[in-house]
A protein has these predicted regions:
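Non-catalytic linker/capping segments at the edges of enzyme domains
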Residues: 1-29
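A generic structural signal for short beta-strands and their flanking turns/coil linkers
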Residues: 3, 12-14, 66, 71-75, ...
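Residues within alpha-helical segments
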Residues: 17, 46-50, 94, 120
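Hydrophobic residues in beta-strands and at strand termini
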Residues: 18-20, 79, 125
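A short mixed-secondary-structure module that forms the rim of ligand-binding clefts
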Residues: 19-45
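Hydrophobic beta-strand-centered segment that forms part of the acyl-chain substrate-binding groove
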Residues: 47-90
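HotDog/MaoC-like acyl-thioester-processing domains
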Residues: 81-128
Length: 128
């Protein structure tokens, strides 16, 4: 079923919310494991790249039938503090720059109002 993460606009940034379930702990009691945090940043980051690309082309996601797909070329994650299990997580994306097919993003994941992880992503528009 995947993460079923939904990303939305929040002004000039993007936002998603996710509440991890106990079976997603990765064996770390009461805390979200790093792999899930990286997956959430990755999933929200590539969706955000598509949204930023669409907005840069003077369109909104709602006006596009199938937005361009983006894939991760690079994802750097800094884990700042433990992330509690069961709390709603907020993932935010901010555009750093666009250069052709490449989009650089800054990402942040927070729980209970505190940032617990930051990410830097380079996403590339997928071309078949």
């Amino acid at each position: 079923d995947g993460l079923q993460l939904k990303s939305y606009w929040d002004g000039d940034e993007t936002i998603a919310r996710f509440t991890p379930h106990p079976e997603q702990s990765g064996g770390v009691p009461n805390h979200v494991y790093g792999g899930l945090i990286a997956s959430l940043l990755d999933c929200h980051g590539t969706a955000s790249a598509a949204a930023f690309a669409c907005r840069a082309a003077n369109g909104e996601m709602s006006s596009v039938t199938l937005p361009d797909r983006f894939v991760t070329a690079s994802l750097k994650v800094d884990y700042l503090r433990p992330t509690p299990m069961g709390a709603e997580l907020t993932i935010k994306g901010k555009l750093r720059r666009i250069d052709g097919r490449k989009i650089w993003l800054d990402l942040a994941l927070s729980a209970q109002g505190e940032i617990s992880a930051r990410g830097e992503m380079l996403a590339i528009r997928y071309v078949e």
